[in-house]
Amino acid sequence: MENNNEKFNVSVVLPIKSSNVIGFDDYFKKCIDSIKNQRVGINELVIVHTDETNLVEFLDSYDFESINVKRYVWTEEPSFALQVNHGVEKCESDWVSIFEIDDEYSNIWFKNVKKYVESYPEVNGFLPLVIDVDERGVFAGFTNEATFALNISSEMGYLNNETLHTYQNFQISGMVLRKEIFLDYGKIKPSFKLTFGYEFFLRLTYNSVKIMTIPKIGYKHTNMRTGGIFWNYKNGEDVLTENEVKFWIESAKKEYFFTSERDIKYQSQEV
């Protein structure tokens, strides 16, 4: 384990729906190892998981070593948004970061965030440059890099509302955000399918929350993992039609003015 006596006051929130997915054990080990190997340690890992028997037994027996782990059992219908929201509410740190079981932090991520927090105290959120890979680990692209594109971002390195109306490919997982900002501006809206992260970013930037991308690789994301939330929207039990995809994108652009959840439901746009 990395010698990380130095710590950053951040809670990592990890929602888990089920362990009955392909490659779960391997994914989980890699994601937890990426926390163990941080150059600067975290304050706590908050896991919000369902009461699935196999999952509970797996977590009960897992060796997290010196990571400060807090677990909360989610007994309602599984929901990425609601489980994340609950986890953030339980956090005991000034900063929070949303994590996924099929993802990994780079070992310098929280070290870099700590340095940037000290240098840019007016900034409330920090995005990593994300490497996207497929299930085989093959490079598929980058995410969050558009804040450095001159034709997309008007303020180099910063995410703003104007940029989001031009370009949507930004990711909330891996991001480090002040806990009070997450809670004060309404958390993640659970009624949103597909575009919950996009709407969240629109809402934050509309309310003048300053978000910066740190220009270093900070996160690796497994794109379209079989059984994952976005895979289900395309291939699984929650498949969205093209019209539904358009609806959720347009709804995000309309609903970010409202801090509170308004329980949006799909309405066909066909005439």
Model-derived segments and spans:
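Nucleotide-sugar-dependent glycosyltransferase catalytic core
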Residues: 78, 138-144, 191-193, 206-247
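Acidic donor-binding loop at a coil-to-helix junction in glycosyltransferase catalytic cores
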Residues: 193-200
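Short, acidic, metal-binding catalytic loop of nucleotide-sugar glycosyltransferases
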Residues: 30-42
